[in-house]
């Protein structure tokens, strides 16, 4: 606020949006102006003071609440706000308390709105907002509000001149006014919206903050400093990220760099930014030692501010970049053929012991070739373009096995299959993909090779079925030591292409595998069928000592209708 004593509040009133309010004492600064309990605030320039008011309020239950504060009055003579001296200053935060969304913290605004503008030069402001819960933030311009939060009649966005712009970047939050036309005071406002994805995958509004700022525009011969572009980055949890920030000034002024954002407000270790004011060009070093507790789906925004030292009016520039902290992958993935199924097993990732945003499950992906795929630095999970498809997910962090049954249909003999596994966290963040394994099914179950209609009839039709026996004494054969006999094959069928109940029509049992291997006849002809009107589907199940080994992939008779 300005330094005017009339506007200096030792206490102020906050309205909680549930029909209640509280008078809150100022809580920062010394005790000279507001004895005996309130404090004085902290001057941050000759004309600006930082005042903090802190209180606690408990809501009665779920709902949506507007938390607001009103303060009379705005300065007189604000150019884009008529009769400004009689318009109250109003700000609000919108809070959604919901059973689906869980605990919620409002975004933190780390850069105060204290910069000035200059006629003919772009004015920039960025609040340096970040959200500790990892909620997504978006930004939009709005009108300044008055009594009751109603937009002030006659308010207008500031003039920009022909071809100029006044906007806010909806992602980075940088407000740009290019360029101010007239000296004087202006009031600007924007909203920072907070979004969270629900169980249906839809983003829902869980809160917003209204920032209202005063900008004093003067005249100067200064030019804005320029921060060089900074690329977004993904980093494996547990490693150190370091970024060098560079800024220049067209006038050769001394530049001061500062940084704010998510990495400065997280659980330790927090980020550091080292830079000293210097004549253009100037550099700063951002560094952050990430740990497992920093893993989350949403990136961490970091906003850099550069301000020059022009003696008339200092101008600024902002740049925002994002850091995504990615979880390490599950390790030691193995794939073991089991009949026409494949059993996957892996070890937990190194970050499995964290609480809060913890591992909820693992998801397994498959494709039908052995071509390798390696993720890019910012590719988490398994993208669709890789050709991998989701096989299934486990139910917990401790469940580190999954059997791929291909939906119960079994996998194809003679096909190479590749697998990857990914850890999925509470906020749906995905780890990097695991090591890729490739495997081919063993020939340890029979394989159907013929299902042919021999006779077409509505009642006396027949179908010929033929299969290949399981192999012995090859690298992909049945392990008879691990799976001793007796051995049994069951041929079953059902009417149609999809059914849950099979009828067994042929069984053969042998004490030793040699008996299976020596079978001369591996065919069966089923009669008494309606092959004119119905298709028939067949499968062969194979057992060792009563243990189900697997099934031949199902096959159906040709049926034209």
Model-derived regions: residue spans:
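Extracellular interdomain linkers/hinges and stalk-like, low-complexity segments
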Residues: 84-134, 199-251, 312-341
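Beta-strand-rich modules
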Residues: 404-430, 520, 526-548
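Recognizes extended acidic, P/S/T-rich segments that occur
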Residues: 44-46, 277-278, 358-412, 482-533
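Pro/Thr/Ser/Gly-rich low-complexity, intrinsically disordered linker/stalk tracts
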Residues: 322-358, 413, 426-483, 532, ...
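Extracellular acidic, Ser/Thr/Pro-rich low-complexity tracts
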Residues: 2-6, 128-135, 245-253, 292, ...
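Residue-level recognition of secondary-structure-to-loop junctions
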Residues: 51-61, 65-69, 179-182, 190, ...
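Short, solvent-exposed loop/turn segments at the edges of extracellular beta-sandwich modules
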Residues: 74-79, 193-204, 306-314, 424-430, ...
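Strand-loop-strand motifs at the edges of beta-sheets in extracellular beta-sandwich domains
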Residues: 156-180, 269-291
């Amino acid at each position: 606020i300005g330094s005017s004593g009339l506007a200096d509040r030792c206490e102020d009133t906050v309205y909680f949006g549930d029909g209640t309010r509280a008078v809150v004492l100022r809580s920062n600064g010394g005790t000279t102006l507001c004895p005996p309990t309130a404090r004085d605030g902290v001057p941050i320039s000759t004309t600006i003071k930082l005042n903090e008011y802190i209180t606690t309020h408990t809501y009665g239950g779920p709902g949506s609440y507007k938390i607001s504060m009103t303060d009379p009055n705005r300065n007189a003579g604000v150019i884009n706000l008529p009769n400004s001296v009689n318009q109250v200053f109003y700000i609000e935060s919108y809070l959604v308390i919901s059973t689906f969304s869980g605990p919620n913290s409002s975004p933190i605004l780390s850069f105060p709105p204290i910069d000035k503008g200059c006629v003919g030069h772009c004015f920039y402001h960025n609040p340096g907002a970040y959200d500790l819960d990892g909620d997504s933030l978006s930004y939009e311009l709005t009108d300044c509000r008055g009594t009751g939060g109603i937009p002030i009649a006659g308010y207008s966005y500031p003039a920009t001149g022909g071809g100029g712009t006044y906007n806010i970047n909806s992602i980075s939050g940088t407000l740009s006014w290019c360029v101010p036309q007239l000296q004087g005071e202006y009031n600007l406002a924007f909203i920072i919206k907070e979004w969270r994805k629900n169980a249906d995958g839809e983003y829902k509004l869980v809160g917003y903050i209204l920032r209202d700022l005063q900008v004093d525009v003067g005249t100067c011969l200064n030019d804005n400093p320029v921060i060089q572009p900074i690329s977004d980055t993904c980093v494996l949890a547990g490693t150190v990220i370091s970024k060098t920030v560079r800024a220049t000034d067209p006038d050769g002024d001394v530049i001061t760099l500062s940084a704010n954002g998510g990495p400065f407000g997280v659980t330790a270790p927090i980020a550091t930014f080292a830079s000293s004011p210097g004549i253009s060009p100037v550099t700063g070093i951002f560094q952050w030692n990430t740990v497992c507790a920093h893993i989350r789906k949403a990136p961490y925004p970091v906003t850099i501010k550069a301000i020059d030292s022009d003696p008339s009016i200092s101008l600024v520039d902002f740049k925002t970049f994002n850091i995504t902290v990615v979880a390490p992958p599950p390790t030691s993935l193995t794939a073991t053929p089991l009949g026409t199924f494949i059993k996957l097993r892996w070890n937990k990732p190194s970050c499995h012991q964290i609480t809060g945003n913890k591992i909820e499950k693992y998801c397994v992906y498959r494709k039908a070739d052995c071509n390798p795929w390696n993720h890019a630095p910012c590719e988490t999970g398994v993208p669709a373009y890789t050709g991998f498809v989701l096989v299934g997910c486990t139910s917990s962090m401790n469940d580190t096995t999954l059997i791929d049954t291909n939906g119960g249909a079994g996998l194809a003999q003679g096909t190479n299959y590749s697998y990857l596994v990914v850890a999925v966290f509470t906020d749906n963040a995905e780890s990097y993909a695991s090591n890729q394994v490739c495997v081919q099914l063993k020939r340890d179950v029979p394989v159907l090779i013929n299902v042919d209609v021999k006779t077409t009839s509505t009642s006396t039709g027949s179908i010929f079925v033929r299969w290949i026996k399981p192999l012995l004494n090859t690298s992909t054969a049945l392990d008879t030591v691990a799976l001793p006999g007796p051995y049994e094959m069951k041929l079953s069928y059902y009417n149609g292409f999809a059914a849950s109940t099979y009828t067994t029509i042929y069984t053969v049992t042998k004490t030793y595998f040699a008996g299976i291997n020596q079978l001369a006849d591996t065919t069966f002809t089923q009669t008494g069928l309606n092959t004119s009107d119905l298709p028939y589907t067949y499968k062969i199940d194979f057992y060792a000592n009563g243990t189900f080994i697997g099934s031949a992939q199902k096959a159906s008779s040709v049926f034209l209708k």
